[in-house]
Amino acid sequence: MLDSTRLRNPQLFDKIVTPEEAAALITDGMNVGVSGFTPSGYPKKSTIALAKAIKEGKRCRINIWSGASVGPEIEEELAAVGAIKGRMPYYAASNKSMKKGINEGKIEYVDQHLSHFGQQVDYGFFGNVDVAIIEATAITAEGNIILGPGVGNAPIFVKHAKKIIIEVNTSIPLNLEG
């Protein structure tokens, strides 16, 4: 349950939406930056909701950007429904639908050195970050995001995103802050 220990700015309670409403903000052709670095600290709910909407007929293919590999709620769920147009800078080979899509040429993939990607996004080399989807532990009274354990390129994506979706994960201990 999201409460004032996790969302400390009362003005932001008006912005809470369901995963399905968050997924509706993501449209065809967008560049979507997600938090996370390996299967840690990455968003889960909105990407699963997006995959479900696509299964039900929504037309949407997006580019997924991250700090490293992320978990199956992004790579497997979205690749399995044909939602991923492009993927950078890395993916987990254990996500079979992603691997198959890349090998069949259905998903454009750049296997780029992880340490270079954030700076290149910052310089605008790959275009705009349309949406950043960030997993957080909490949001402070000032509106600052307390990230989860896998930061990755989240700060760069937030800096440049036109829209920001924050998934507050209440299972992450609050003492991660600091």
Annotate each language-model stretch with its function:
Residues M1-G178:
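Conserved alpha/beta enzyme-core scaffold
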